[in-house]
């Protein structure tokens, strides 16, 4: 069974770099408190790592 990542945006993107804003948008997050579930792939891990100070991540099945 494939693992998934539950990603929640906990900090806003105001006053963040354009790259960080684009990364948050790519993950499908647009409001504080919004949660998305994404497949656990190296690409998604890299996106999360780039904005790790703005999001929380949980592994789910």
From Swiss-Prot:
| A Pfam family that the UniProt record links to this protein | Ribosomal_L30
- The protein's superkingdom reads Bacteria
> Which keywords, in A-to-Z order, does the entry hold?
Ribonucleoprotein, Ribosomal protein
Biological process (GO) annotations held by this record are: translation
Q: Which InterPro entries match?
A: Ribo_uL30_ferredoxin-like_sf (IPR036919), Ribosomal_uL30_bac-type (IPR005996), Ribosomal_uL30_ferredoxin-like (IPR016082)
GO function terms (MF aspect): structural constituent of ribosome
GO CC field: cytosolic large ribosomal subunit
Q: Write down the HAMAP family for this protein, in alphabetical order.
A: Ribosomal_uL30_B
Describe the subunit structure: Part of the 50S ribosomal subunit.
**Which NCBIfam families does the record match to this protein?**
rpmD_bact
The similarity annotation says:
Belongs to the universal ribosomal protein uL30 family.
| Protein name stated in the entry | Large ribosomal subunit protein uL30
